[in-house]
């Protein structure tokens, strides 16, 4: 099948994060089975979502992982020109939810299976399909934990997030948290009988603001990123039910993005310490999502290979995060390189071009020849 035909099938299977993905996983399994490729089904702790891992070539020698996620962001509230879950072809563009992020890469991975099989690979090419990436890379960690039983230590992992097929070397880490402050409700005419949860929440918001300013002023700094320092923001604040009720609860959702070398958890810990010190209220917190930074590589082996395969110089860093940080944390050299543009991701009328799919397949074909040499 052509990558365009496969992409049409994948777009029609609109798996949202946090939802069962049996239909998508079944499609990938059936496709691989047609070419005699076995696929390990790795059920996550949720029970209704799976990662998939398949190998082409010898299993007992180090090879390369091609990794991508199967879920896509929702289309609710967006105005599309056409059905987002039906591929529309127009002037060399292929429109549909997930075309750039990142079903285009998955389609190219699958389309190249027969070519890989014909190459008599001396080093294997592994195909990794993860779930729930769009809500904090929740699924891939369960697959990474099982890699030792699935393959020899890999030489590298190519995470195919949309990068205009330009290799990307690093990204920041992230942790998103929800903070809950519980006071005591009362009638607004007798505020002394209640404990207003919004006021201590305001103290936390000011602490987050001041912490952000401290990071901006004092670093640590990494000029490869923009901005060149870690950041912390409060993105959601919810509290109160009515103006005549002393609010008994306030919720803050905050996010940290940290430069390599500074963990997001270390920054969050400062906020949690301030939260715990609040008087007269009960407090709690929970992690919404997190992933580690992808630091610049210690050597250029994988970067040099991808520059040769793509014909493009590597980009030092990007502002978004990926599953590559998790692969790296597990000891797998990792790089980001995929077709499509991040500027089109998550937007109405998301698209990828036919030329971008062709370019990705050409890059993967060159990888196959490298693995066969």
Regions found by a protein language model. Name each.
Residues 75-89, 154, 169-180:
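Acidic-glycine-rich active-site phosphate/pyrophosphate-binding loop
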Residues 45, 169, 176-373:
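Metal-dependent amide/peptide-bond hydrolase catalytic core
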Residues 102-176, 372:
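Acidic/histidine-rich catalytic neighborhood of metal-dependent amide-processing enzymes
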Residues 70-71, 93, 128-136, 162-165, ...:
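Acidic, glycine-rich active-site loops and adjacent beta-strand->loop/helix elements
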Residues 63-126:
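Active-site metal-coordination/substrate-binding segment of hydrolases
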Residues 90-92, 112-127, 150-153, 208-218, ...:
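Phosphate-handling active-site elements
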Residues 1-76, 249-253, 268-270, 354-356:
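N-terminal helical capping/dimerization or prosegment-like subdomains
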Residues 40, 65, 126-128, 284:
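A structural signal for isolated positions on well-ordered beta-strands in alpha/beta enzyme cores
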